[in-house]
Regions:
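A short SAM/SAH-binding and catalytic strip from SAM-dependent methyltransferases
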Residues: 137-151, 174
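A short acidic, Gly/Pro-enriched loop at the edge of an enzyme's catalytic core
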Residues: 127-138
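Class I SAM-dependent methyltransferase SAM/SAH-binding core
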Residues: 63-128
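Conserved alpha-helix/loop element of class I SAM-dependent methyltransferases that forms part
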Residues: 28, 32, 42-62, 77
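Core SAM-dependent methyltransferase catalytic element
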Residues: 224, 230-253
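A short glycine-rich, Lys/Arg-flanked "PGG" loop and its adjoining helix->strand segment in the class I
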Residues: 152-167
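C-terminal alpha-helical "lid/dimerization" subdomain adjacent to the S-adenosyl-L-methionine
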Residues: 171-226, 230, 236
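N-terminal auxiliary segments of SAM/dcSAM-dependent transferases
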Residues: 1-24
Length: 253
């Protein structure tokens, strides 16, 4: 790969094409997004998201930006947990902004989102977020960073929009560290997920890309270094389900 090309799954394509090609993938799977995550995680993505929310520990008055937020399910979990705290302790309600470059993904989540008064949907690019500096307490991105063309640029944007003391949480598929688990998951991913995608959505190609994009994503240690390079402190990560997914976090200090 040279500076003029970038990975799109296992393909090498011109850098300027990736954003549109990724958008086309998610246009094609928007109506089946939750089923897609079920297929790629054995249905465990819901548990991973709940564990992520527990780690975040949402509080009243906090402002969340959920980048690549799609249908808004993570933002909904954030607001629900923050509201439970508010009911016990008092204070103002939390607010969430679901930001996604793909309007079809945002539209797919309209009917699913509760607490509509406290949640807004914004069409925007992770590499150039439509938010001012120092405006958010928490920024999340779940299963989205691997699809971003320039991940380092996006991480720098995340740092920009967070307030001092703000927290970043990145949930992403990863490569299992155990060789036996990796072999099993690779066999499942490459042999069955595209077939499931074809069965559920008539779209094997998009699911093939999503599987390949996981294998092209940096290791846990390398991605942690990328987060630190963007300015974050106290960067750490936790593997879920043997490393099928990983939660990364860091602070803007």
């Amino acid at each position: 790969m040279n500076k003029n090309t970038i990975d799109f799954g296992y393909q090498e394509i011109p850098v300027e094409e990736k954003k549109e090609r990724v958008k086309n993938v998610f246009d094609s799977v928007a109506g089946k997004y939750d089923l897609m995550n079920d297929a790629m995680s054995f249905g465990v993505h819901r548990l991973w998201k709940n564990l992520t929310i527990t780690k975040i520990n949402p509080q009243p008055r906090e402002i969340l930006i959920d980048v690549a937020g799609g249908t808004g399910d993570l933002a909904h979990r954030f607001l629900k947990r923050a509201e439970a705290v508010r009911v016990r302790r008092g204070g103002e309600s939390a607010t969430a902004y679901v930001c996604d470059i793909n309007d079809q993904m945002l539209l797919a989540g309209i009917d699913q989102i509760k607490n509509k008064n406290n949640i807004s949907r914004v069409c925007g690019d992770a590499q150039k977020l439509p938010f001012p500096d120092n405006c958010a307490d928490v920024l999340t991105i779940a299963f989205g960073i691997r699809n971003v063309t320039d991940r380092q640029s996006a991480l720098t944007e995340f740092f920009r929009v967070l307030k001092p003391g703000g927290r970043l949480f990145v949930l992403e598929f990863s490569t299992p560290e155990d060789k036996n688990l990796r072999k099993i998951y690779d066999t499942y991913s490459f042999s069955f997920i595209p077939k499931i995608g074809n069965l559920l959505a008539g779209n094997a190609e998009s699911y093939q890309y999503l599987v390949e994009s996981i294998r092209r994503f940096p290791s846990q240690n390398k991605f942690s270094i990328m987060i630190e390079t963007s300015g974050f402190s106290k960067v750490s990560f936790r593997n879920f389900s043997g490393g099928i997914a990983t939660l990364y976090w860091g602070w803007k200090i």
